[in-house]
Structure formats: structure tokens, C-alpha cells
Amino acid sequence: MSTKYETMYILRPDLTDEIIDQTITRYQTLLAEQGAAPVETQHRGKRRLAYELKKFKEGIYVQMNYDAPTTAVAELEKAFRLSEEVIRFLTVREED
């Protein structure tokens, strides 16, 4: 059974456009492999952070909306924790 989720994650501001695109594609592919569908991704661009995170004052915001089983969300968050590119993330379940 799948549920609707929204995930917002913040990438380091010093990444190149190529690495940003590769990172976004990696997480979209990870979700698809875990049974998520459809993955809608919005690249929100570089924004100033309200406070410093891991010594960064800016971050690149990316939002994903998708239907997925809870195991897919767990795998995605595990990948975020292990990634050096992601400085913060949040996943919430959308209400119908």
C-alpha cells in the first residue's frame, strides 16, 4: 500500500550544476526502484538559510512529491543521511 509523501531536502551551495542534476536524478531513481510513482521534482534553487547549517549560510532546495510504500521513504532517508551533498531533509505524509 502506498501513501503520498512530500520530501524537501537542502543541498550544499558549493555544488556544480552537473553534480546537482546527478544528485537529483540519483534520488529519483532510488525512489522509482523502491516502487514510488510518480516522482514529481521541483528544483527550487539557491536560497539563504534562516540559520547556519553545517557552516553553510545558503542551500539549494529540492522538493519531491510521490506515492510510495513506507520502506521507500526509509531507504531515501538512509541515502540522505549517508550523503555528503545533503545538509538537511524533511519528509512529511500528505493528507488526502
From Swiss-Prot:
Transmembrane segments: none
Chain segments annotated as coiled-coil in the UniProt record: none
One Pfam family hit: Ribosomal_S6
A GO-annotated cellular component: ribosome
NCBIfam families: S6 (TIGR00166)
Function: Binds together with bS18 to 16S ribosomal RNA.
UniProt protein name: Small ribosomal subunit protein bS6
Gene symbol of the encoding locus: rpsF
